[in-house]
């Protein structure tokens, strides 16, 4: 297969011939090992939205989480609705979803996001951004709490009845959002580049609007060229104690460790909020008594997980940021199959995270404990520091920085390979050198205190550094 890329600035054409199947295998192997790269299916991104037939419009890329494809100068403006709050009579045989309440919420939310867009329009730093936002007026209304919603309804995530419920909720959300944007267009005018005929001729519009909404758009146009997206909502959902985005519950519980000054660690089982609520309401003593519809990311078949995202993508004109969490035993071949199934089901993008892979995840289970990290001082009590002898092996590097040469020495245990000490020196005096000496001492004492090198590196990477480095 011939890869082709043209640099707009210079007109330079870059081409490279690759073995497509071999490249796909390499992508799957890398993802299995490190949870990157994710996949974007660009034909689906361009072919399933409100601007498919608008020739002057083109996507320049996506935001980092990939749920919001944007043109050059586009702005990411998102908001999410908690679906679990629309379940009436939760955890009972009479539980039902409040569709009318959702429609009212969507109408208010679309208006609210448009108000935020107006407020922020003059604040964008670049003229290109201000012009793009004014011309296309893209917003991204999404959802969170889906897994909690299904549990309250007594539906099993990924099963046929849950997929059907999501299909109904998704259509109601899309139809209501488009209608709300049309009513805003009536009040304040459509977005600058709005071409009603082109919008109404798109497959996405035809599949997601009622006759009443079609008539509103035909009459008034739309205030926004893009309306719906689904973000991961990791911080929002954690703050609210609900499931994130369209994700299943990651685990029914996690273990919390309390450390004492006497070298004794105590572990507590902490239940996910939705699990805790159900157990209290039904008087359960253990999660083993939970009904079968309490599935988790690690017990769910990945095809069911893809099926859920597929039905939601049918109703989302932007995209969906979503991670398929798979167990540690997941193979490279299964990773390939997952990518292919995602494409076949019409997804715009997908990310795969194998529990226990080399990349440290935000959420983890205990299954990966078999992949032990290298650390010095196995069995140290809390507060103990390992003494280092001369029996070490070392590596020396000289790095060139914006402030001159930096001399680096790392010493390791010759038997285990664990880091023991580091020495950093600028070879000069002054505050920069003093900082490097202090940093190397802190790295050394952390390593000799039993902290593995991956954790040390992760902490330092997250803190940033002087731009000259």
Locations of regions flagged by a protein language model:
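Short, Gly/Pro- and small/polar-rich lid/capping loops
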Residues: 211-219, 364-405
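C-terminal binding/interaction regions
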Residues: 463-469
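Glycine-rich phosphate/pyrophosphate-binding loops
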Residues: 153-159, 320-322, 346-359, 448-463
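Function-dense linear segments that define catalytic or interfacial modules
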Residues: 31-133, 143-153, 242, 247-282, ...
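Catalytic alpha/beta core of large soluble enzyme barrels
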Residues: 60, 66-69, 113, 117-121, ...
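Short acidic-hydrophobic surface loop/beta-edge motif
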Residues: 1-6, 228, 392-401
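Conserved, charged catalytic cores of large soluble enzymes
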Residues: 1-57, 80, 88-93, 143-213
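Internal maturation/activation junctions in enzymes
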Residues: 105-130, 134, 156-233, 320-321, ...
